[in-house]
From Swiss-Prot:
The lineage of its organism: Eukaryota, Metazoa, Chordata, Craniata, Vertebrata. Its main location: nucleus. PANTHER family: HOMEOBOX PROTEIN MSX, HOMEOBOX PROTEIN MSX-2. One of its GO terms (cellular component) is nucleus. Expressed in neural crest-derived mesenchyme and lateral plate mesoderm. It is found in: Nucleus. SMART domains: HOX. InterPro entries: HD, HD_metazoa, Homeobox_CS, Homeodomain-like_sf, Msh_Homeobox_Regulators. This is Homeobox protein MSX-2. Keywords: Developmental protein, DNA-binding, Homeobox, Nucleus, Osteogenesis, Transcription, Transcription regulation. Gene3D superfamilies: Homeodomain-like. Residues 90-108 have a biased composition (Polar residues). It comes from Coturnix japonica (Japanese quail).
Amino acid sequence: MASPSKAKEVFSSDEEGPAAGAEEHHKVKVSSLPFSVEALMSDKKPPKELPLAAAGSSADGATVGTSRNMLLPGHGSRDAHSPPGALTKTFDTASVKSENSEDGTSWIQEAGRYSPPPRHLSPTACTLRKHKTNRKPRTPFTTSQLLALERKFRQKQYLSIAERAEFSSSLNLTETQVKIWFQNRRAKAKRLQEAELEKLKMAANAMLPSGFSLPFPINSPIQAASLYGTSYPFHRPVLPIPPVGLYATPVGYSMYHLS
């Protein structure tokens, strides 16, 4: 008859035997996983076909999930070594992108469907200036009449009533026509005189040194008339402003001697 100590040892060995066998079997299964550290370090290719096993243990479930990921088309070795949750994230991202693209397409279609109709802009009417209905036609002067009027204007810019009546009858024109022509000619002479004075002033300022100015305003009518040989307004100056004589004279010296 065996002693109690031997029975305990046999009992303990019987209990430890199945437990040790289960641990060794678990280690073998864990080491055979394709995403374990040993498999990654050894660079061994995972088996293409895995034997079917019962879905009882967690290790078998992980192995089956990994085999499903490997058998899916479009997934390479990166998906084979990735955890099972990565596939779910990939499907979620793809579904979100498809929903966003569908929403954008529908929004574009709705925007094109409800676009406002094009507006037809009518061209703005250009309003032309209308002349008076009772406006008299422009008098066509002949060449001989224009030459006579120009000679008379050079002699005298303002005509008296008697002179205008006599001059208009000699040209076969009315007094009103002669009067209007003289008014227009005086306005033209004034514009020409102002342009000549402006050119003269610009030329004088260009020749003067910095900080020096003319002792009188060149645009005043009295001083401007002194620059001309006669009182005729549209004559060119007999002597333009000489730079040497102007520099030699003092500032307060006038230029009446130039004429």
